[in-house]
Amino acid sequence: MISNRDHFFGKFSDHCINGFCLIIMCILSGAEIRKQLKEGKIIVEPFDYANIGIASVDLTLGDEFRYFVHHNGPVPISDEAGAKDYQKFSRIMKCDDGHPYYLGPGQMCLGITKEKVKLPSNLCALVEGRSRFARLGLSVHITASFINPGSDNQTVLEIFNASSLTLALYPGTKVCQMIFMTMEGEAHYNGIFQDQAL
């Protein structure tokens, strides 16, 4: 009889030692990212090749932010809640002409990348913050860092200020980086956030 463990880890058996199994994922290097961009497999618009790092691509902050307003009573967090209910409790602000959005201590807002990224069906991605900003208490994604294969979107950022400082968020800042990973098989995202917007 094949155990559940064997069924799950069977294809990783070559990477198992004394019962400990490693699940290997392939992260694209900067050179491979550049190659796939030139071949049109990954599409980033608008794009500057100077934003390619050792194993990631820097993405910049757009000029729209969604901030939350006061609401009386609890807001339900459940599977039955609408995926876009957050829009009922928030408003959009646009920052023009180099003006920043000010994020106070302990506050959260939604931002969006200037760039739209299109992934092929065999690649997924992660969005990570940058260390220089994290050291000031800035988190650019609270939990939702995974980008599905086949996505064709700007990336919405759940931005949180964990510091005691007021942070000035300037549109155009390289605020996060995207890491690309190959996956076994192919898939295509067709979920509710396929057309991302604040």
Question: What does each model-found stretch correspond to?
Answer:
Residues C21-L198:
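DUTPase catalytic domain/fold
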Residues M1-F9:
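N-terminal amphipathic/hydrophobic targeting modules at extreme N-termini
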Residues K11-I24:
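Short, Lys/Arg-enriched N-terminal segments with co-localized hydrophobic residues
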